[in-house]
Regions:
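Conserved small/polar residues in nucleotide/adenosyl-binding loops
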Residues: 208-209
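A short, acidic/glycine-rich surface segment
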Residues: 77-79, 173-179, 201
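Acidic/His- and Gly-rich active-site-bordering loop/insert found
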Residues: 2-100, 123-128
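Acidic/histidine-rich catalytic neighborhood of metal-dependent amide-processing enzymes
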Residues: 107-183
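Glycine/serine-rich anion-binding loops at beta->alpha junctions
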Residues: 98-113, 200
């Protein structure tokens, strides 16, 4: 079995212009990689009225518990004005030891790291106890209604249980890759009123034109 190089895979993923909700063939591409590692895969497409259809991928290796799931998304925010980039955002480049391209940080490199780590683990631990799965969505950067929630609902109907889940979003505000956080440590309810113009850092063009 061939070990998958995480940098090479990250570059390949960045080349897909997967601006939410565009798939551009990336789920099929990743599915093919996972099948070679022995995964059983399913591309799940969901659509809600008024929104474009979204493709997601669920893949699992093994049938036993516990099921350890890697979760993430392959869609990216718009690249904006291409003249503001020093490179084509969908043609990855290495500069000063950093991988540059749309989605390099959020979060195609994480997906590549998942798959690379799995390829190493499977090579060294054939016949391991338990299962490994990946839940990869395509609308995290958008309205996020046809991704994780609907995939989880689908899995519940199939009585597919995820025991543990690792989300590869960057978490350390100071140095990349040096922190693991618990996703939810509690909750708080309240009411907050904010006045002004609504906007989002990923979509400044909408703010300026509103």
């Amino acid at each position: 079995m061939k070990i998958i190089n995480e940098l090479q895979l990250a570059k390949e993923l960045i080349r897909f212009p997967t601006v939410t909700p565009i798939d551009a063939g990336i789920m099929k591409f990743l599915e093919k990689k996972l099948k070679k590692l022995g995964f059983k895969t399913k591309i799940l497409e969901f659509k809600e009225k008024g929104n474009a259809p979204v493709k997601n991928l669920y893949a699992r290796l093994g049938k036993k518990s516990p099921n350890f799931c890697y979760a993430g998304h392959l869609d990216v925010v718009p690249a904006g004005n291409l003249s503001d980039w020093t490179i084509n955002p969908f043609k990855p480049s290495i500069k000063n030891g950093h991988l540059i391209g749309r989605g390099a940080n959020d979060m195609k490199s994480s997906i590549a790291a998942f798959v690379s780590a799995i390829s190493v683990f499977v090579e060294k631990n054939r016949g391991f106890n338990g299962s490994i799965s990946l839940l990869i969505t395509g609308d995290e950067e958008g309205v996020a209604i046809n991704g994780t929630k609907k995939v989880v609902d689908y899995l519940k109907k199939k009585r597919e249980k995820i025991d543990f889940c690792l989300v590869g979003e960057p978490t350390n505000p100071n140095k990349l890759g040096e922190m693991i956080k618990i996703g939810r440590r509690g909750s708080m309810n309240g009411r907050l009123t904010i006045t002004g113009v609504q906007g989002h850092v990923a979509y400044p063009c909408l703010l300026y034109t509103s």
